[in-house]
Every structure is written in C-alpha cells, then in structure tokens.
Curated annotation (Swiss-Prot):
The protein, known as: Chondroitin proteoglycan 8
The entry's keywords: Glycoprotein, Proteoglycan, Signal
Signal peptide bounds: 1-16
Glycosylation sites: 63, 65, 87, 93, 114
Record field: compositional bias (Basic and acidic residues): 38-60, 74-84
Disordered: region residues: 32-123
Amino acid sequence: MRPFILLALLFSVAIAFNIFRDEAVPEEQLLSVRRSTRGADKKADSSDSSDSNEKDDKVTEGSGSGDTPVEAEEQLRRVARDVEEASGEEEGSGAAQVTSAPVRFVRSVDVEGSGSGDEAPAE
C-alpha cells in the first residue's frame, strides 16, 4: 500500500510540474505582445502612448546591458574606428583584429543530426 501512495504522489508532482512549465510564457512571446499592443495604442491615441513607446523602444532595442540605442551606436562607431586605425597601420596584413564588440547570447540552439555517426542505419 505504501509504495502505491508514493507512486501516486510522484505522478501528481510530475503532472503539476508539467502544467506549471507549460504555462510559462517565453520572452519572445512577451515582446511580440508588447509590440502588438504598442501598435494598437498608436492607432487609438498616439499622443498618450508616445512616451511609453519611446521607453519600450529603448528597452527592447538596447544591447541587453541597459545601454540605450545611442550608446550602442557610439560603441559600434568606436569599434569600427579602432578597426580602421589598426588596418591602416598594418597595410600589408589584410586583416584587422577586433578586440571588443557587443555580444548577444542565444538562449537555446537546435542541433540537427547530433548522433555520433557510428551507428549504421537499420535495414
């Protein structure tokens, strides 16, 4: 009787975890909802929503580190200028080394054909 109760408890916890996990909303979906509501706000009343839209643009278009788009552009210009200076000094090398650039991280990657390749197909 006791193993049956433990098994039932295990199944109920697993089911509750799966339901909770399925209800989580991915970040991309939240951003698309924010953009669609922003578009609806522009159509309804552009004067009231312009301030919040500018704030949302700064948040969604930044580099992820809290930089505003203007700061990100300045950083890119600085990196490009450093690369041009380095390539101008090393005239014959044909390659310049970039030492700093904004980096965006990918949350997950789908890998196709991730098998080891040692297995022969079943015939």
